[in-house]
């Protein structure tokens, strides 16, 4: 994307998470990396705003930021990365405007004819559903850090169980069976 002269927006759910990513990206991309978030002074935000909108500027081709970075005046956006896309911090409740940054990133990418990459070890249910419906592509990691075993994920349509008069709870029959088996083995459960 950068070789094509385009810009990259790297969204993080929390400002506190930017330090590690900034160091890694600046090591590789140097002064092409800029950071933008609401805790910057007005002067700092204006400076980044100007660099991002300037078609002749080679600095700040990669912008790392939280939700507010979506509103920068990108002049040639080629890729938006939404790291930890499942995180509730991407939802803006107060003050207005109310929005979901992940969904806004997808719309912004379409407006710029850019690509969107949603990253998460635990994707949001709607994202996982969109991959199952092949609306989104899915890249799976088959090995976890430290050799931890991958969980077995099964999607169950509760509406079908309700129609068959098999279940009227918020939990599917296979989930309840798995919980019972885990408890019988004295294992822990997290919902």
Task: Identify the role of each PLM range.
Residues 18-20, 43-46, 72-73, 88-91, ...:
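Switch/connector loops and helix/strand junctions flanking conserved nucleotide-binding motifs
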Residues 103-190:
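Conserved interdomain linker/interface between the two RecA-like ATPase lobes of SF2 helicase motors
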Residues 66-117:
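SF2 helicase catalytic motif II
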Residues 2-25, 44:
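Conserved Walker A/P-loop ATP-binding site and its immediately adjacent core
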Residues 23-63, 71-77:
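Conserved motor-coupling elements within RecA-like helicase/translocase cores
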Residues 5-8, 32, 56-62, 76-79, ...:
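Loop/turn-to-beta-strand initiation segments
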Residues 33-42, 87-99, 159-168:
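Flexible beta-alpha connector loops of hexameric P-loop NTPases
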Residues 20-24, 28, 48-51, 80, ...:
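Alpha-helical scaffold elements adjacent to nucleotide-binding pockets in ATP/GTP-utilizing enzyme cores
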């Amino acid at each position: 994307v950068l070789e094509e002269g385009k810009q990259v927006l790297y969204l993080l759910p929390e400002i506190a998470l930017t330090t590690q990513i900034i160091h890694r990206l600046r090591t590789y991309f140097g002064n092409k990396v800029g950071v933008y978030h609401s805790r910057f002074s007005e002067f700092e935000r204006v400076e980044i705003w100007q660099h991002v909108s300037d078609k002749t500027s080679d600095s700040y081709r990669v912008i790392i930021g939280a939700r507010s970075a979506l509103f920068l005046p990108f002049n040639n956006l080629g890729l938006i990365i939404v790291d930890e896309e499942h995180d509730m911090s991407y939802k803006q409740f107060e003050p207005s405007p109310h929005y979901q940054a992940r969904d806004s990133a997808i719309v912004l990418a379409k407006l710029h004819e850019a690509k969107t990459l949603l990253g998460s070890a635990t994707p949001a249910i709607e994202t996982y559903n969109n991959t199952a419906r092949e609306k989104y592509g899915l890249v799976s990691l088959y090995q976890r850090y430290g050799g931890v075993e991958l969980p077995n994920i099964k999607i169950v349509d509760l509406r079908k169980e309700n129609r068959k008069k098999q279940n009227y709870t918020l939990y599917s029959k296979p989930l309840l069976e798995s919980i019972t088996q885990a408890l019988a083995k004295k294992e822990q459960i997290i919902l």
